A protein has these predicted regions:
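Short N-terminal helix-initiation segments at or just after the protein's N-terminus
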Residues: 1-7, 42, 82-85, 100
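Compact nucleic-acid interaction/catalytic patches
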Residues: 3-6, 10, 14-56
Length: 106
C-alpha cells in the first residue's frame, strides 16, 4: 500500500465514491491505518468550482473527482482491492492538499 495507490471503496458509499487514493507518506507504512481522499463519481458531485482543488481523473473507465474535504483515515483491512496508482499525478494531488491546508485565507 503505497502513497497514491488507488483502491476500491469497500464502504457503504461505494456507488458515489467508487475509489479512494492513499495520500499518507510511506514513512508511516507500519501504521495499521491509511489516510485516503475519496475519488467521487464526476456525475455525482456538484460542478467543480476549483479545478486545482478538485482535479479530475479516470479510473477503470470511471470519471472521478478528488474530494479533499472528505479526507479520512481508514483501517488497512477496510480498503478494497488496489486498482491502480496516481503516482504520475502526485504533484496535482499534493497541490490540492496544499490548498486544503493553506493559511493564505486567514
Amino acid at each position: 500500500m503505497a502513497q497514491f495507490d488507488v483502491h476500491r471503496n469497500a464502504g457503504r458509499h461505494k456507488d458515489g465514491i467508487p475509489f479512494v487514493v492513499i495520500v499518507q507518506s510511506s514513512q508511516f507504512k507500519d501504521y495499521r491505518r491509511r489516510v485516503v481522499v475519496p475519488l467521487v463519481r464526476a456525475d455525482a458531485i456538484s460542478p467543480v468550482r476549483f479545478r486545482s482543488f478538485n482535479p479530475a481523473f479516470t479510473i477503470k473507465g470511471v470519471a472521478v473527482v478528488l474530494h479533499p474535504l472528505e479526507i479520512v483515515s481508514v483501517p488497512t483491512e477496510r480498503l478494497g482491492t488496489k486498482v491502480g496508482s496516481l503516482a504520475d499525478s502526485d504533484q496535482i494531488i499534493v497541490d490540492a492538499l496544499d490548498e486544503l491546508f493553506s493559511r493564505a485565507w486567514k
